[in-house]
């Protein structure tokens, strides 16, 4: 029974991390983050 709880917690952690990462990537591509030299290097330069 304890193993199932651990698996569920692990899945929740992965889902939360993935959601945060998706939000961060969307923010960067949306241009809400101020454009910097790193944005140009990675190819996400704003038009």
From Swiss-Prot:
Primary location: membrane
Which InterPro entries does UniProt cross-reference here? Answer: Lysis_col
Q: Which GO terms describe its biological process?
A: cytolysis
Q: Name one GO cellular component term.
A: cell outer membrane
State the lipidation positions (N-palmitoyl cysteine): 20
Q: Is the keyword Lipoprotein assigned to this protein?
A: yes
- Record's protein name: Lysis protein for colicin E8
Organism, scientific name: Escherichia coli
* Subcellular compartments: Cell outer membrane
Q: Which UniProt keywords apply?
A: Cell outer membrane, Lipoprotein, Membrane, Palmitate, Plasmid, Signal
Q: Show which residues constitute the signal peptide.
A: 1-19
- What is the documented function of this protein? Lysis proteins are required for both colicin release and partial cell lysis.
Instruction: Report the membrane topology from the UniProt record.
Output: Lipid-anchor
Q: Which classification does the entry list for the species?
A: Bacteria, Pseudomonadati, Pseudomonadota, Gammaproteobacteria, Enterobacterales
Give residues with lipid attachment (S-diacylglycerol cysteine): 20
């Amino acid at each position: 029974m304890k193993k199932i709880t651990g698996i569920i917690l692990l899945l929740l952690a992965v889902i939360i991390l993935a959601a945060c990462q998706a939000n961060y990537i969307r923010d960067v591509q949306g241009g809400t983050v101020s454009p910097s030299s790193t944005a140009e290097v990675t190819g996400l330069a704003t038009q």
